[in-house]
């Protein structure tokens, strides 16, 4: 990389982009007023969030190609515009199919394109400190959720209209994207000489034939499921099962702890390695889920566990970009991580709908807590198996 590039200043700009993208997780706050204002079924409404999460990997494939070809900034700007437009248009919808299109599809496409551009572009400026760099950038998502939730509260208080609140949020997002993009530069294309070739390098075709990819894919999907249980439904869980009068505070606190977690796990990953850190993350999340199950109605336990899951979930998002490049090289990281992110989509699509559906038909979230614990324990076993297998493969490569 050119010595003239201030990579830390670039890092700050990328964090600001994620302030905007973190707004996607503020959907948990909007669910209750949307149900009240539009009389929509909670499980069906949750599909909007699931569509948004599920569609994200598709533009990440396109964005990955742009990044690897030296067009990271363009990916961020185009994605940011689409993301903002999705919120703006959501302010004009009056039925669920249109919300699925605006918030689900349009905002989801923008989120995926901007997210992969933002993360993988900056990682190419930090080959020596990938865990820390990804942790700092991804912390912006958590902080962004906090900021956007507070903005949503403010707009709701001023307008008493969820549609106008969505519209105003979209406009704010668009203004931020326009300003911050002036401080971002694209990383060099993979064939420009800016990224050194490595024996680890694999393109997506070879990666998809590699058992390591599918093991990591499954581990990611299992972990994301647990995080999405809280990210998508923390407000509803707190109000229906733990006696909270409002879900806004827990959404804000989960966002804060998620941001702290991204910084914490990023630094820890650089010290302990991705696989060891992942085991710690999954076991801690298991503990939180079991506490939720055994201490029903205890508000203190709910806050501890919900914040704990938010804190731990951050580790999953920080660890996997590094694991992808460690196994398949940095040369094609943009496109490769786009495919890996489909594992995120699997967990993200299933979790909100399953959580809402189980709560609707059983009257509580207890079954969700047990299901999540079992999935996480499977993830721990797969992580230990993968760690051993990867060590054998890498020993042969080197």
Predicted regions and their residues:
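Conserved MFS/SLC helix-loop-helix module at the cytosolic interface between two early adjacent transmembrane helices
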Residues: 58-96
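Helix-loop-helix hairpin linking two adjacent transmembrane segments in secondary transporters
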Residues: 141-185
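Interfacial helix-cap and linker-helix signal at transmembrane-aqueous boundaries
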Residues: 34-35, 66-67, 147-159, 238-239, ...
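Hydrophobic core of transmembrane alpha-helices in multi-pass small-molecule transporters
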Residues: 98-112, 301-314
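C-terminal transmembrane helical hairpin of 12-TM major facilitator-type secondary transporters
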Residues: 252-258, 263-264, 269-323
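Flexible cytoplasmic inter-helical loops of multi-pass small-molecule transporters
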Residues: 186-202, 393-398
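Intracellular juxtamembrane helix-capping segments at the cytosolic ends
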Residues: 34, 113-126, 134, 315-328
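Extracytoplasmic gate region of multi-pass secondary transporters
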Residues: 27-31, 211-265
């Amino acid at each position: 990389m050119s010595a003239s590039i201030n990579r830390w200043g670039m890092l700050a700009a990328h964090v600001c982009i994620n302030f905007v993208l973190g707004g996607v997780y503020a959907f948990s706050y909007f669910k209750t007023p949307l149900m009240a204002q539009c009389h929509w079924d909670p499980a069906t409404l949750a599909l909007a969030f699931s569509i948004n999460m599920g569609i994200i990997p598709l533009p990440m494939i396109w964005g990955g190609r742009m990044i690897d070809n030296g067009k990271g900034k363009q990916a961020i700007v185009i994605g940011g515009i689409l993301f903002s437009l999705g919120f703006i248009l959501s302010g004009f919808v009056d039925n669920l199919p249109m919300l699925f299109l605006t918030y689900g599809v349009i905002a989801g496409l923008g989120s995926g394109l901007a997210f992969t551009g933002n993360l993988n572009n900056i990682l190419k400026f930090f080959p020596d400190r990938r865990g820390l760099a990804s942790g700092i950038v991804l912390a912006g998502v958590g902080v962004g959720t906090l900021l956007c939730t507070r903005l949503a509260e403010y707009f709701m208080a001023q307008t008493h209209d969820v549609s106008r609140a969505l519209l105003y949020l979209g406009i704010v997002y668009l203004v931020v994207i326009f300003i911050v993009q002036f401080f971002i530069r694209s990383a060099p294309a993979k064939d420009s000489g800016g990224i050194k070739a490595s024996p680890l390098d694999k393109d997506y075709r070879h990666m998809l034939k590699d058992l390591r990819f599918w093991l990591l894919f499954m581990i990611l999907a299992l972990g994301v499921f647990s995080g999405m249980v809280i990210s998508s439904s923390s407000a509803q869980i707190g109000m229906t099962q733990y006696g909270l009068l409002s879900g806004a505070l827990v959404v804000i606190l989960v966002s804060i702890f998620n941001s702290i977690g991204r910084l914490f796990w990023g630094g820890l990953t650089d010290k302990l390695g991705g696989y060891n850190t992942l085991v710690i993350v999954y076991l801690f999340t298991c503990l939180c889920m079991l506490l939720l199950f055994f201490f029903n109605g205890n508000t203190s336990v709910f806050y501890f566990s919900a914040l704990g899951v938010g804190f731990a979930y951050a580790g999953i998002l920080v660890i996997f970009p590094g694991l992808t490049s460690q196994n398949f090289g940095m040369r094609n990281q943009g496109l490769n991580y786009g495919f890996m992110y489909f594992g995120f989509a699997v967990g993200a699509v299933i979790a909100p709908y399953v959580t809402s559906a189980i709560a609707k038909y059983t009257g509580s979230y207890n079954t969700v807590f047990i299901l999540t614990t079992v999935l996480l324990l499977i993830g721990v076993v797969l992580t230990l198996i993968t760690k051993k297998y990867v060590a054998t493969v890498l020993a042969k490569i080197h």
